[in-house]
């Protein structure tokens, strides 16, 4: 049997379910696939298949995530669901599964809970741009006023973390009832609420800008000198495109340098342009082999700057995950592995936080000893003696 080709006839969007434990994230994921299996030929995934998520490794951290795919009339979705709270935290901080938007599941019977708040905060910190809310377990609430109260609480919570509370779509329903309905092959009133939710997701979460359409950025992995041709910088293009003749900048570690691309090669073949995802060599004019080093980036001029001080959201590996066995305190100085290199930096803890235990996630301020090209959303690993002890994402640039 020939391998099925991925048909690109619909825009592709990555989403995920977030929210407090036992509010019904996985049941909702199963219900969406079940309802869309009846209408759009999605492959139905039952609860157990989603809940027994395979483990993946990302930046040296093991994360259990379930990937489900389905289609609405307008789009193709890849949907990620994590079984445990720690998996969510790790997933969002490492960016193991990028999310263009999220479905926040809140139990109508319980209202927002601590992890509801934490997942909204994390979404803000790691740059999940849009949230749509599903108020689950509506079948367990008889009081209309209680539903309105929970909805109001959710909107206030979103506002608190700079999401547009008033404009966020909130759809009430019951994932369990919808799942039971869809399993019979006939859709009823509960399934209609799942369809309403997906219509809101279709409409409210915009199509993401493709990596190719963004500003050019390539982390430097290696530098060679080719006699008669000059200096070649190799790496994998993270985003954007680069063409022969383009003016580019070399940013990070040292003073920013300007240069022009005189050639692009991939697999020893000449190319006119390199695209996001390509591993290639870029020939640069007037730059010596010793003027560039691993850890810098090539980029479109003026699009990314070198920084040393920032705030970040980090997850610290537990002892079982191969992390530290002891807590660390303010002024801890590990290495920060950003894109292709390690840079030493000092960690400052927020006021009122005495220490950070293995397994915690925390907001910190970092000061690096060298400037590195970075922006909000840049991911990094925290290492000590060559082993990963944490992972983080830049929340805000300070200097």
Swiss-Prot record:
Region (G1): 19-26
Region called G2, residue ranges: 60-64
Main location: cytoplasm
Subunit text: Monomer.
Function noted in UniProt: GTP hydrolase that promotes the GTP-dependent binding of aminoacyl-tRNA to the A-site of ribosomes during protein biosynthesis.
HAMAP family assigned: EF_Tu_B
Name of the protein in question: Elongation factor Tu
Protein source organism: Sulfurimonas denitrificans (strain ATCC 33889 / DSM 1251)
